[in-house]
């Protein structure tokens, strides 16, 4: 069996099947390493697909013209921050998958990814600061539920979601400030 970041050994995935299966009893072979590597790559790709929803809704002259709070971060920080956060999210989802398979925590992960993907077109595409605020509040809630669900399966996975929740908390405050400073 494999251990992850000092956690107890990962149980064989076939434990949920009656009697198990011969091919799944030993989870330490080369095929498991390949399977885990491909799964991690899949989680990274799937997670990085979320921001592609906003590729046609990038900040432009409209965003530059908005009145911003003094604590608005410089534009260059968003790319590196989101790259790090998406990587942490993917690794967290992979850790949960390794321990629990495709269950409720990963369904919540998919829901929060959908909310994540929806914010950019609403904010930057439709220029709807109020609706973007409603949407990001739903995203924040979905992230919290995902974090708690991940925590129950894998504490390291839960911890990996904390920076994401913190960043979206900040983004929610920023969205609120922009909405208040720029009435329609």
Give the residues covered by each predicted segment.
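Membrane-helix boundary connector in multi-pass membrane proteins
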Residues: 123-129, 145-158
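Membrane-interfacial loop-to-transmembrane alpha-helix junctions, especially the N-terminal start
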Residues: 100-109
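N-terminal membrane topogenic signal
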Residues: 28-43
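Alpha-helical transmembrane segments of multi-pass membrane proteins
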Residues: 47-61
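Final/C-terminal transmembrane alpha-helix of multipass membrane proteins
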Residues: 161-179
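Membrane-interface helix caps and helix-loop-helix hairpins in membrane proteins
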Residues: 121-131, 179-182
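Membrane-interface loop-to-helix entry segments
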Residues: 73-87, 127-139
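Membrane-interface helix termini and inter-helical loops of multi-pass transporters
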Residues: 59-71, 181-184
């Amino acid at each position: 069996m494999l251990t992850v970041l000092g956690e107890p050994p990962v149980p064989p995935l076939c434990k949920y099947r009656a009697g198990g299966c011969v091919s799944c009893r030993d989870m330490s072979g080369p095929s498991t390493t390949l399977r885990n590597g491909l799964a991690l790559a899949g989680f990274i790709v799937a997670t990085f697909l979320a921001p592609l929803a906003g590729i046609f809704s990038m900040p432009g002259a409209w965003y530059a013209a908005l009145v911003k709070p003094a604590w608005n971060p410089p534009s260059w920080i968003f790319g590196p921050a989101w790259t790090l956060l998406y990587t942490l999210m993917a690794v967290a989802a992979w850790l949960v998958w390794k321990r629990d398979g495709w269950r409720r925590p990963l369904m919540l992960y998919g829901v929060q990814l959908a909310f994540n993907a929806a914010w950019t077109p609403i904010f930057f595409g439709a220029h709807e600061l109020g609706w973007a605020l409603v949407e990001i509040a739903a995203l924040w809630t979905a992230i919290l539920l995902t974090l708690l669900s991940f925590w129950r399966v894998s504490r390291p996975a839960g911890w990996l979601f904390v920076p994401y929740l913190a960043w979206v908390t900040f983004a929610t405050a920023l969205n609120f400030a922009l909405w208040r400073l720029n009435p329609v």
